[in-house]
Amino acid sequence: MIEKNTGVLERYTGPLSRRIQEEYAIGESYYQGEVKRGLRNSDGTGVLVGVTKVGSVQGYLLQDGQRVPIPGQLYYRGIELNDIVEAHRSAGTFGYEEVAYLLLMGYLPTRQELDRFKEIMSQARKLPEGFTEGLLMRHPSGNMMNELARSVLSLYSYDPAPDDTSIENLLLQSVKLIGRFPSIVANCYAVKRHYFQGDSLHIHFPVPELSTAENFLRMIRPDTNYTEEEAHLLDMMLMVHAEHGGGNNSTFVCRAMSSSGTDTYSAIAGAVGSLKGPLHGGANAKVMEMFHYVKENVDPRDDGSIRDYLVKLLDGTAGDRSGKLYGLGHAVYTMSDPRAVLLKKYARHMAEIKGYAEDFALLQKVEELGIPLVQERRGDDTPMCANVDMYSGLVYAMLGIPQDVFTPLFASARIAGWCANRMEELITCHRIMRPAYRAVTTHGRYVPMAERTAPTSEE
């Protein structure tokens, strides 16, 4: 239950906020030189803080100190994501379980190893007895990512050895979390719909012989019905989002927390909190918000109309007035984001049969017309591309997945990468992460109370 707002605290904190903003302000000049703001180098690349075998993101080559753009590539344990996805699409098989095995174990499984892993995963999908009734239904939340983080922390209490960081126990915890995340998300959504939207409560249990993608669609829909094509498209989404290198914000948070020696549930909950941010996992929802503004204000058959409205978005006079075109550009990818390429390739047919063909075409126009506009604003022609968030929201919408489930479902895929990176951090690093901040305050003496001057206004 949301606590009653009396306004007392707000009347106190409101007037102080402006002074606090002034006190916290740091001049841009302090960020020159050695300071790596946002852990970024001056050319926008990430500061190198470690090495990893789990995932690799490639969008450019370095030649003579200069970035040379290349088509984007994403590797899981040295194997290109595109090859993994294409293999499963050609065979008509579900691939997320194999990807999870590959990321965790470091190698591709044999048929026997994969079948055994799927069997274990089917057992891991079951939530602890009373978990949904005692936690999710007793304390419902309007935000599913907060509910997911709280659920992860609560799993600590169900674990007989939650602080054991042996490889065997880390692997056990990882398999359980990978299995349970989709079940938690599906149940969180059912509870949220019931308590906050007044819908009937439908809790569906996972079916052992079904894949992660099939089970999720079955659990999240009141009638449990889904098509094979829907399940395979969601399976591809899970594979695409399973891992993205150690430097992305949520994975880095997980590794930084793991370096302190904390337990698995705390580290993963921290990653969930990071992914919630609109600059990270919440970006696909911002793309969909922007897209709705575009749809309402343009003629989709007129490129000039679309371009004019995109200019207004960049000017900050339309949409959310942020001055941003969401879904364009990436910290690493330059010429293409391989994840976006895969989504565009395989979502087209679903768009046609689900009645989203016009939306799909308009989104492509936003990409096509938006990139040169952003480049023009930046004053350079450095290659940039649509990122995965440009198309993932529309794919989720085509699958009937509501917007407040977008990021939790992202987490249900990325949990495999988080767990693999946590294991790697604990096995290989053995040193707490401890970056430095340069203090830029001026020194002064302690002023006795009688000599202090009151603020000019606190009313």
Briefly describe each language-model feature range.
Residues 1-459:
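Non-transmembrane, aqueous-exposed alpha-helical and coiled segments at domain scale
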